[in-house]
């Protein structure tokens, strides 16, 4: 039976994880969490933590990690659907009836995963081959280590419009197009979407390749081509619900207690190359509500670290405006301001990873950033100017849905 991600998310939200785990494991309150000796390995000092707000447990000793469903399958040995049915009964939810169309969609998604996996293997092989000298030179100039290149799965898409079609001949044209690998234009022959680009795989939370991003290698030869090109939305990929590098950054964030949001995937890789592994990026769009919720499942106060130019600061303000209506107790954003004109890679190369760590250690609050951005937006030379500032701040405050947080922001800002 195929259950939708939305239904499963609702089940997790209605389930109090500590109550489920507490039936078979003695839990002790530890701040906002509960702790216990881990049931998955022998230990005397508790390193197993349960977080009801985020809906997961994690052991810092053996790395066991999961939600209520995973607990019932791993700790009690229940089959997946039996675990779901037990939790649904307790939550007062009805398990959806089997849907043949859902099964067909699941089968199609599995087939499309085969397409993206095959494409990724081909891209990586191209980078290592004779045609990969130009992208290899670019990666060398960027200072990416061989280990980073392998870990992040860099590849190369050649300029030939039919190269991928020939290489992935086991898949028909329809599947290649549905996976976002080919472009179909009425009255013309289909052609490869990614050509003469340095390629990066985009993964889902389980680490499966679901889409790609490509950086153009010869922008002067094609001035109209975008510098970066992502896969379109497909049955596998919804860019507004996906964060680049989340499957790698989430374990690192659990260790460090922080999650960093940068503008693009090359920024996330540059941070990882410098040893800062808990960085993610949206995919060509402003940070969405769904992405903010994804971040809050990992940490309570993700750190925005956008470029230190006007575009980067505007992107930060768009993210803040998107987050304000969603604010709730213990959930907010923090903001790091990079030096003017610099992105994370520039700062690391100029001043070293230590300079980046120093900035990340002292981020500004959302409230302070909001005040300073609006304060600098226009001069305050007259009573009218000051009234305009107050009106802009009040508009922001009024968008906050949580009454207590709205009242506190109003008191601080006005």
Role assignments for model-derived ranges:
Residues 1-103, 165:
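N-terminal structured subdomain of primase-like DNA metabolism proteins
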Residues 3, 30, 104-119, 158-298, ...:
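Phosphate-handling DNA/RNA-contact segment within nucleic-acid enzymes
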Residues 6, 82-137:
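Conserved active-site segments centered on acidic
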Residues 9, 76-91, 197-217, 345-350, ...:
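Structured, non-catalytic alpha/beta "coupling" segments that mediate domain-domain communication
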Residues 11-14, 102-113, 129-133, 154-161, ...:
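Conserved phosphate/pyrophosphate-binding and hydrolysis machinery centered on Walker-type P-loop NTPases
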Residues 38, 59, 72, 139, ...:
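Terminal peptide-recognition signature
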Residues 76, 254, 285-340, 346-356, ...:
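Conserved catalytic cores of soluble enzyme domains
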Residues 330-413:
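C-terminal or mid-to-C-terminal helical accessory/interaction module adjacent to the motor/catalytic core
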């Amino acid at each position: 039976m195929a259950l939708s991600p939305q239904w499963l998310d609702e089940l997790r939200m209605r389930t109090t994880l500590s109550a489920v785990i507490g039936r078979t494991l003695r839990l002790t309150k530890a701040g906002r969490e509960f702790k216990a000796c881990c049931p998955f390995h022998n230990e005397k000092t508790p390193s197993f933590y349960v977080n009801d707000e985020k809906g997961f447990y994690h052991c810092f000793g053996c790395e066991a990690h999961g939600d209520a469903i995973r607990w019932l399958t791993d700790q009690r040995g229940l089959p997946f659907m039996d675990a779901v049915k037990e939790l649904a009964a307790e939550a007062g939810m009805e398990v959806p009836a089997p849907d043949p169309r859902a099964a067909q969609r699941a089968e199609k998604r599995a087939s499309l995963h085969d397409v993206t996996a095959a494409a990724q293997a081909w891209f990586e092989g191209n980078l290592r081959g004779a045609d990969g000298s130009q992208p290899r030179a670019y990666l060398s100039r960027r200072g990416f280590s061989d280990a980073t290149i392998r870990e992040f799965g860099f590849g190369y898409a050649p300029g030939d419009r039919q190269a991928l079609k020939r290489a992935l001949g086991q898949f028909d044209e329809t599947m290649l197009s549905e996976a976002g690998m080919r472009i179909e234009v009425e009255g013309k022959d289909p052609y490869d979407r990614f050509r003469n680009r340095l390629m990066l795989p985009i993964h889902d939370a389980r680490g499966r390749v679901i889409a790609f991003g490509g950086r153009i290698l010869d922008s002067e030869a094609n001035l109209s081509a975008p510098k970066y090109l992502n896969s379109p939305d497909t049955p596998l990929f919804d860019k507004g619900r996906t964060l680049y590098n989340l499957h790698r950054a989430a374990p690192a964030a659990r260790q460090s207690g922080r999650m960093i949001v940068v503008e693009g995937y090359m920024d996330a890789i540059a941070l990882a190359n410098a040893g800062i592994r808990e960085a993610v990026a949206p995919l060509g769009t402003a940070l969405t509500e769904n992405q903010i919720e994804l971040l809050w499942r990992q940490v309570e106060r993700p750190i925005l670290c956008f470029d230190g130019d006007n575009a980067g600061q505007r992107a930060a303000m768009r993210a803040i405006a998107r987050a304000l209506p969603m604010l709730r107790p213990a959930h907010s954003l923090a903001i790091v301001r990079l030096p003017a004109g610099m992105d994370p890679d520039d700062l690391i190369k100029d001043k070293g990873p230590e300079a980046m760590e120093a900035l990340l250690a002292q981020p500004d609050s959302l409230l302070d950033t909001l005040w300073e951005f609006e304060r600098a937006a226009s001069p305050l030379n007259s009573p009218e100017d000051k009234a305009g500032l107050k009106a802009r701040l009040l508009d922001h405050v009024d968008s906050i849905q949580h009454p207590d947080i709205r009242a506190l922001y109003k008191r601080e800002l006005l």
